[in-house]
Amino acid sequence: MSDSQGNTINLDGIVLKAGGHTKRDAEALCVMEAVAWVAGEPHSDHPVCACPVIGAFLRQWNDSISTDEARTRLLKPLVPRLVGSKSTEAVEVRRSYLALDWLAREYAPAWLSLRNDLKAHAVALRGLAPLTDTASCAAAQTTLDAALAAAGAASRAAAGAAAG
């Protein structure tokens, strides 16, 4: 693979790391810094060529994966695909709603369903209409607020129990 200046870039040797890095080093890059490198851009975790919505999602995911091996295995294949992913504002708004919808109707319910006292909230979230615009988000707000409040209460109760 080559960057925009024709320099050869070998992604095989890259191990993705958590956090931001002050300089470009093939042995210490996060996923979005690798995208900037492949694109031939200055060192940054906010490459101009990449969709900012996808970039925000991937920076968070990059830093939440607990091992370099898992991070590299999951995220490195995405690096070449992210170069040139920046699009119009309308496309980026659509992508932001897709991410929000996934978070509210898939990700959160997966975790809530692990606790018997939160399963009803998981079911309610999964039953929401797709979150595609401000109107659909407003219609879902009561259900989202209830799930958040219940999860927060469960978290505080668990912390209190752990503290003794």
Can you name each region flagged by the protein language model?
Residues M1-G164:
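Short, glycine-biased loop/turn motifs at secondary-structure junctions and
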